[in-house]
């Protein structure tokens, strides 16, 4: 996949070991490590670091960027008895504490990754110097289930690819052109490695009750055409009152940083400068 190969040119793959298994980081921009706060990227559900494939090379111009495969996703092992964000969060905390010791990090958390960070920040607020939440769930604003399709054993390869395309368009993208053959390949690769099968927490409003425990600045970025918030996007800053800023990227779907990377970078750059 050319997009992935291009992003990996200057990356270092780091394997971090724990008693319960290994996690994998991809790290860029280590020349900035001594002079800047580490920037940690947490991907969305059924994903990997590749959710940030269109962003890492830009972000690494000024930061040391650490993109994690969350435990149970991508190349990282699944800890015991973990199936959703609530049981995952303590293990992510352990990963961050081992990687950065007592140093607080800046966080970019997309969707499920942002939810996990929000749960973690309520218990360990000093882990984060700043959190930038991107299209996060668990705000109690989902109105209905998306029209996602499942696979059957009778489907051939082209039928399976059609299901992946449909699901990407139902949840992740606003534009048909975004669901290219390369991105369908990427989706297939990521979904096949997802061992976190529950999304119960995402449909609750758990973050609303925890947000007052967050002690760092918190910012929100959403795509204007996020399928999860079609009728409720304007309510996000109303219910998530801890946000220091709320920005909407025009003409972008849920996977906003992939679909409109330039507009996304303009917003993130300003936040990271501060």
Model region roles, listed by residue range:
Residues 24-75:
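Conserved HGGG/HGGXW glycine-rich cap/lid loop of the alpha/beta-hydrolase fold
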Residues 3-23:
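N-terminal cap/lid segment of alpha/beta-hydrolase-fold proteins
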Residues 26, 53, 66-108, 266:
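Active-site loop/oxyanion-hole signature of alpha/beta-hydrolase fold enzymes
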Residues 118-122, 128-159:
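Flexible "cap/lid" loop of the alpha/beta hydrolase fold
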Residues 252-261, 265:
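Catalytic histidine-centered segment of alpha/beta-hydrolase-like enzymes
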Residues 109, 113, 117:
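Gly/Ala-rich beta-loop-alpha elbow adjacent to hydrolase catalytic centers
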Residues 219-252:
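Conserved loop-alpha-helix segment in the C-terminal half of the alpha/beta-hydrolase fold
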Residues 144, 158-216:
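Conserved alpha/beta-hydrolase catalytic His-Asp/Glu region
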């Amino acid at each position: 996949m050319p997009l992935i190969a291009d992003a990996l040119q200057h990356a270092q793959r780091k394997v971090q070991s724990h008693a319960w298994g290994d996690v994998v980081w991809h790290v860029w921009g280590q020349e900035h490590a001594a002079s800047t706060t580490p920037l940690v990227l947490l991907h969305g559900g059924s994903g990997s670091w590749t959710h940030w494939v269109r962003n890492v090379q830009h972000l690494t111009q000024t930061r040391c960027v650490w993109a994690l495969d969350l435990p149970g996703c991508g190349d990282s092992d699944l800890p015991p008895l973990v199936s959703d964000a609530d049981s995952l969060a303590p293990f992510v905390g352990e990963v961050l504490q081992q990687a950065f010791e007592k140093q607080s990090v800046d966080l970019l958390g997309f969707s499920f990754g942002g939810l996990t960070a929000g749960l973690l920040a309520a218990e360990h607020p000093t882990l984060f110097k700043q959190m930038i939440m991107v299209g996060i769930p668990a705000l109690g604003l989902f109105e209905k289930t998306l029209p996602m399709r499942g696979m059957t054993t009778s489907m051939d390869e082209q039928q399976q690819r059609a299901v992946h395309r449909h699901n990407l368009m139902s949840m992740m993208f606003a534009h048909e052109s975004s669901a290219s053959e390369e991105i369908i390949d990427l989706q297939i690769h990521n979904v096949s490695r997802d061992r976190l099968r529950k999304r119960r927490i995402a449909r609750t409003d758990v973050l609303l009750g925890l947000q007052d425990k967050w002690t760092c600045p918190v910012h929100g970025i959403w795509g204007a055409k996020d399928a999860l918030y079609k009728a409720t996007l304007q309510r996000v800053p109303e219910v998530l009152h801890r946000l220091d800023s709320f920005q909407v990227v025009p003409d972008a779907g849920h996977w906003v940083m992939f679909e409109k990377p330039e507009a996304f970078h303009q917003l993130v750059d300003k936040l990271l400068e501060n």
